Structure formats: structure tokens, C-alpha cells
Amino acid sequence: MIPIQLSVFFMIIYVLESLTIIVQSSLIVAVLGREWLQIRRLMPVDMILISLGISRFCLQWTSMLNDFCFYFNFNYVLCNLTITWTFFNVLTFWLNSLLTVFYCIKVSSFTHPIVLWLRWRILRWLPWLLLGCLMITCVTIIPSAIGNYIQIQFLTMEHPPRNSTVIDRLQKFHQYLHQAHTVALVIPFILFLASTILLMASLTKQIQHHGTGHCNPSMKAHFTALRSLAILFIVFTSYFLTILITMIGTLFDKRCWLWVWEAFVYAFIFMHSTSLMLSSPTLKRILNGKC
């Protein structure tokens, strides 16, 4: 049990972090959206960033509402928000993975025929890849939608079933949903991890070839991408730690430690959002007043 004053302090920190992330996401969407309206085209990385900005904007608002409903025991509202949070959470994971794969293909110095083939075609495929992320997300949240519907029906029953067999089946079904949601996040994480390793290998190869004294555009591109990927790796790891804490949540009061953990996790998300903004040449040019 932590003091109420400390909980309030971390709650305020979490709200400030969330509002900052919302402003950052809004800025990404507004700036890149204006650029698209003016010139009727966007750089490929900006297409991913504007999709990620929209997803993260919706995710952050849903996350705030979800956390406060959990903390204050608004169970019925929580059930309705959970499916929305799950959708934008999975979509954000897939968009982040797509961004890392794009960086890996376009920035790496590998000359393997498969890499060259992908590098030539990924620009044409990008709109379809974004649509694919959306479709995969819709499919993967179907079990969660079914589970939330059952839970809402259970909460609204005037006389809930007391049969232990029914309750056990519901508990097993929720365990299955938890595992399905974890798998839906593990797959994009593996894609992200593979892309990161390949980029690191490419950077090492470049350093060995050119020496540490040279700083060509390719090296700068590597460092920019790896800066974003390093922070994103911390975010992914932090999120999996939250899943682990949820699984062993009987050891402590999750509601008591909610704001401490959320403030910790969203500090990394804030850093990643900032890094993403700096990784876009269009955003850097406009924000620096060089448009």
C-alpha cells in the first residue's frame, strides 16, 4: 500500500504525460495533413507516421478513460472501453512494426536480391500494407469483442449464475482471450526485433567499411532510425512487463500501483513520440520554420 498523496502525484504525472502525447499526436496529424493537402502527396515514412499519430491519439484518450474507470470501479463503462483500447493498442503495435520494417528495407545497406526486390516495391505496397495492418487488427480483436460482450451480459444480469462450472468456463475463456491478445502483440514484436537486429548489423557493417571518422548520409539515417528503434524497444519491453504484472497481480493491489506503473510506461511512450517527430524530415523542416 502506497500513500494516497504519492498515488495522486503519479496520477497527475500520468495525466500530464498523456496530454503531452495527445498534443504530439495531434501535431503530427495536423502538420502532415496540411502538407498532404498542399502538395497532394506524402513521403512514405510520413504516411506511416500520420497513421500512427491518428492511432496513438485515439489510443491515448481511450487509455486515460480506461484507467480512470478501472481505478474508480466503473465496471460497465470499462467493459465498453476495453474493446476500443484493445483495437487501437494492437493497431499501434502493427504500425510501429511496419515503420521499423520500412526503415530496415530502405535504410539498410544490404544488397541481397530479396532486400533489393523489397526496396523496389515497398513504396507501391505501402498503402496496402497500412490497410493490411488495419485488417489484421480487426481480425485479432474478434475474440476480445466476444469476450467483452459476454462480460457485459454477465454484469447486466439481475441474477448472475452461481454454478461453479459456468464460472470456471468463463474464467478459462478469459484466459484464452488474454493469451490471444498476447499472441497478437508478440507477432509484431518479433518483426520489430528482427528489423532492429538487421539495422544494427547494417550499421556495424557501414562503420567497419567507412571507419568511425566518416559520417555520410547513410550513417546519419542509420543513427536516426536506431534512436527511434531503441526507444521503441524499451516501450515494447515495458508493455510486456505490464502484462507480466497483470498475470501476478494477486501479489499486490493493482489499483494501488496503477498510476506509478502507468507514469513509468508512458514516460517512454512520450520519448518515443518525440523521437518519431524528429525522425521525419517533413516535420523537422516545418517545425523549424523552413517550409
Swiss-Prot record:
Q: Where in the cell is it found?
A: Cell membrane
Where does it primarily localize?
membrane
Outline which residue ranges sit on the Extracellular face: 1, 63-84, 147-182, 250-257
Q: Which UniProt keywords apply?
A: Cell membrane, G-protein coupled receptor, Glycoprotein, Membrane, Receptor, Sensory transduction, Taste, Transducer, Transmembrane, Transmembrane helix
Protein's membrane topology: Multi-pass membrane protein
Name of one Pfam family that matches: TAS2R
Signal peptide boundaries? none
Please name the GO terms that the record assigns under molecular function: bitter taste receptor activity; G protein-coupled receptor activity
Cytoplasmic side of membrane: 23-41, 106-125, 204-228, 279-291
Q: Mark the transmembrane ranges.
A: 2-22, 42-62, 85-105, 126-146, 183-203, 229-249, 258-278
Q: Which residues are glycosylated?
A: 80, 163
Query: Might you report a single GO cellular component term?
Result: plasma membrane
> Any remaining note in the record?
Most taste cells may be activated by a limited number of bitter compounds; individual taste cells can discriminate among bitter stimuli.
Sequence similarity: Belongs to the G-protein coupled receptor T2R family.
Question: Briefly, what is this protein's role?
Answer: Receptor that may play a role in the perception of bitterness and is gustducin-linked. May play a role in sensing the chemical composition of the gastrointestinal content. The activity of this receptor may stimulate alpha gustducin, mediate PLC-beta-2 activation and lead to the gating of TRPM5.
Task: Describe its partners and assembly state.
Answer: Interacts with RTP3 and RTP4.
Record-given protein name: Taste receptor type 2 member 16
Q: Source species, please?
A: Papio hamadryas
Q: Which gene encodes it?
A: TAS2R16
